[in-house]
Amino acid sequence: MNKVYVIGMGPGAYEQMTVKAVRTLEKCDVIVGYTVYIELLKEYFPDKRYLTTSMRQEAARCRMAFEEAAKGAVTAMVCSGDAGIYGMAGLMYEIGEEYPEVAIEVIPGMTAALGGSAVLGAAVGHDVSLISLSDLLTPWELIEERLRCAAKADFVICLYNPSSRKRSTYLAKACEIMLEYKAEDTVCGIVKNIAREGETMQTLTLKELKETTVDMFSTVFIGNKQTKVIREKMVTPRGYRI
């Protein structure tokens, strides 16, 4: 049976891809993906045939991968981070209903919440909620409700897609909601370009975060009541006795 692999390639660096992801890509004939992600792979897998689409062409990209697999090519659909967390795995299964002759295998990768947490120190040390601020596929009213629920329950909150040209005020809006439930001095963190050239990180308070500008390459972390700064790193204790 023909097969297409849906591969999470991690946050960016080749060294942070899983061994299974690398070995699977090595045996593939065709690699399909968003243009930015494909450019990250070409250096390490130069002999592959690459097919790309731009942003907002996700369904077409999936069908492209299935068409190649249906022809007999060993095919991979690549996603940044993990294929199942804001990735293409779900859409691949949905569109895969049109291609019953093609099997699907998902290869996990390290999502930004984990890669960014490590850069910050130990930001995600306890229960965590992952929320995307992009309203391209989810209405803002629902995003706002999820933010309120997560803040009220005192989760560590990791915000994906915190800003873009059209959503430059969304992080500030999210922080306003957080401040209804969390203290102004709640420890927060920002990591930009996780595991890529130009990686930066900073810790700051929730009050400061509300006034901070970030971009689409940033991942934002908002701590819980126990989160603190140790050695200039953001640390959320698990609760062990010391």
Show the residue positions of the predicted features.
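Short gly/ser/thr-rich secondary-structure transition/capping motifs
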Residues: G10-Q16, L137-W140, Q202-L204
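A polyampholytic, Gly/Pro-enriched intrinsically disordered region
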Residues: A73-C79, A123-L133, K207-M216
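A contiguous loop/helix-start segment that scaffolds small-molecule binding in enzyme catalytic cores
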Residues: V4-V6, T75, K152-I242
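Class I S-adenosyl-L-methionine
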Residues: M1-I104, M110, G115, K210
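Short, well-ordered secondary-structure micro-motifs
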Residues: Y44, M88-A89, G116-A118, E141-I143, ...
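Class I SAM-dependent methyltransferase SAM-binding "motif I" and its flanking Rossmann-like core
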Residues: I85-A153
